[in-house]
Each structure stands twice: as structure tokens, then as C-alpha cells.
Amino acid sequence: IPYQINMTILNKKAPTFKLPSTDNDNFDLSKHVGKNIILYFYPRDNTSGCTTEAIDFNKLLPVIKKNNGIVIGVSKDNLESHMKFKTKNKLKFDLLSDENIKVLKKYKAWGLKKFLGKEYMGIIRTTILINTKGVTHKIWSNVRVKDHAKEVVEELKKINKT
């Protein structure tokens, strides 16, 4: 199977990491315990699916914040690309650069993909919902962009009530 969903981390402490962020600092996952974290991995800045996904999460930010949540986007694009993407789309959340694909691999968001009959290694669109205790609550892998952000936010609302 080309898509290896990382179920080994489901209901376990989310793997910690530090990555360069568009907020001009390193994002350290361990410093955000106490928040519900929507951590989403996307293939590339300024592509149609990735732009739609980012804008959809951005539109839902008020609801996400109301439910003690934050959104963090991760791809292997560099920070310069992320800054342009963030500015162009007026994104109000941070994007992280994983140029060495270490975090992408850790979360199984890097793997074998197929397109037009060709196989290659790339980013598998994946979203991880991490609860306030730093535990991986839900994983969406090989995400279809349409209505995805809404689905994630519905799950966020459920865990915020518990």
C-alpha cells in the first residue's frame, strides 16, 4: 500500500519536534500542550489544493480558537516560500518548514505516491489532531481537500467538550 497511515502514534503522545516557523522563531510542539493542535502536512505552497486547504482552515480560525485550538501547516517548502504563501492568502496561522523531511517522516506524511502512472516519494496530505494533553486524537491520511477543514473542526468541537 503506498499510503502508510501512522496508526502507531494514534492515542499516544504526539512525537515532539522543533521546526522553523513563519513567526520568525522555531515552533516547538512540546510548548503547546494545553492547546488542541491541528497539525496538517501539505505538498506545496501555491498549488490549487494546498491553497484551498489553507484558506479553508483560515476561514474556520475563529471557531478553532473558540475551541482552544491552533492550526499549524507543514511542508518542505522553505520559509521564504511560506512567507509569500501566507501573505498572498492572508493566512492568520503559522507555516513550518521541514526541508529535511524529518518531521514529515516521523508522522508518516512522507511516502510513495502515484501520479499519472508514475511512482515517486512525496508529501502525503495528512492532518493530525492533537489534544490538550499532547496525545494524537485522530489522523486523516491521503486527505481530499473538499470539506476537510470542516470535518477536522467538527472533531475538534467534540474533543473540546470532553
Language-model region placement:
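Chalcogenol-based redox active-site neighborhoods
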Residues: N6-T162
